Amino acid sequence: MARTLEPLAKKIFKGVLVAELVGVFGAYFLFSKMHTSQDFRQTMSKKYPFILEVYYKSTEKSGMYGIRELDQKTWLNSKN
């Protein structure tokens, strides 16, 4: 019985591993895009504000302050 489950277990493991890698690379791409583009952050603030909040908190925890304030100032000035 254990022998027949081995190939299934390997397939499941590979599937989980691929899903993890896709998630890590997706998160890196999203962070990179938000970190380099204020316009993208503005789009994220309208569509997915909770994701932008995670970005702001993670950058503040890493010691990079002022991004949130700069964004808010720029967006407020662009409305006027």
From Swiss-Prot:
It is a single-pass membrane protein. It comes from Homo sapiens (Human). This is Protein CEBPZOS. It is found in: Mitochondrion membrane. GO terms for cellular component: mitochondrial membrane; mitochondrion. The gene is CEBPZOS. The chain crosses the membrane at residues 15-32. Keywords: Membrane, Mitochondrion, Transmembrane, Transmembrane helix. InterPro entries: CEBPZOS. The lineage of its organism: Eukaryota, Metazoa, Chordata, Craniata, Vertebrata. The keyword Glycoprotein does not apply.
